[in-house]
C-alpha cells in the first residue's frame, strides 16, 4: 500500500485534484498544495480516533457502509456537473467527526500556508473528505479487514507509506504540538 501523498501523485490523485479544484473553483496548484497538507492531517486525526474502541468501531461501520470506496468508481460523474450538495454535507459531517472543534483552526492554517482563502479551504475539505474515506474504505476491502482492531495499522500505513519519518513527526506535531490535544496551535507552528 502506498501512502496518502503517493496517492496524490497517481492518476487517481491527479483526477481528484483536478475535480476538487474545478468543483471548488480554485487554482489547481493551490488545491494540490492544500490537499497535500490536509489529507495527511485528516488521516492522522482518523488514526487517533481509531485508537479508541468506540472510534474504531464507528470508523469501521462507516467503511463497511457508505464509505466503501464506491465513490471512486465514478469520479467523472461526481465532478461532472459540480459536486452534489449531499457530498459536501457528508464531507462536513466527516470533518466535524474527525477534527471536532479544531476544524476551523485547521482550515485557517491551511489557508495561510496554501494562499487560498479559508472559505475555499473549507470547500476543498468538504469535497475531499468523502473521497478520502472512499480511499480508506477501498483499502480496507482490499485488505479484507473485518476487525476494527486492524484500522490503526492500516491508517498508519497510509500516513507512513511515504517513508518519511520527518513527515510523520510533523503530522503528530500538527495534531498535538502542545501535548494538549489541540490541533489549532499545533498546525500554526508548521
Per-region residue spans from a language model:
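A structural "flexibility-hinge" signal
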Residues: 1-190
Amino acid at each position: 500500500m502506498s501512502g496518502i501523498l503517493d496517492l496524490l501523485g497517481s492518476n487517481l490523485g491527479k483526477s481528484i485534484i483536478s475535480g476538487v479544484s474545478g468543483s471548488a473553483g480554485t487554482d489547481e496548484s493551490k488545491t494540490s498544495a492544500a490537499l497535500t497538507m490536509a489529507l495527511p492531517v485528516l488521516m492522522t486525526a482518523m488514526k487517533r480516533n481509531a485508537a479508541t474502541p468506540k472510534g474504531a468501531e464507528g470508523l469501521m461501520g462507516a467503511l463497511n457502509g457508505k464509505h466503501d470506496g464506491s465513490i471512486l468508481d465514478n469520479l467523472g460523474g461526481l465532478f461532472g456537473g459540480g459536486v452534489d450538495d449531499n457530498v459536501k454535507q457528508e464531507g462536513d459531517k466527516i470533518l466535524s467527526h474527525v477534527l471536532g472543534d479544531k476544524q476551523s483552526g485547521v482550515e485557517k492554517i491551511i489557508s495561510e500556508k496554501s494562499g487560498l482563502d479559508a472559505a475555499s479551504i473549507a470547500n476543498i475539505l468538504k469535497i475531499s473528505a468523502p473521497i478520502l474515506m472512499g480511499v480508506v474504505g477501498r483499502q480496507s476491502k482490499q485488505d479484507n479487514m473485518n476487525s476494527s482492531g486492524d484500522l490503526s495499522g492500516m491508517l498508519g500505513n497510509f500516513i507512513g507509506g511515504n517513508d518519511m519519518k520527518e513527515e510523520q513527526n510533523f503530522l503528530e506535531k500538527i495534531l498535538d504540538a502542545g501535548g494538549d490535544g489541540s490541533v489549532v496551535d499545533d498546525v500554526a507552528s508548521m
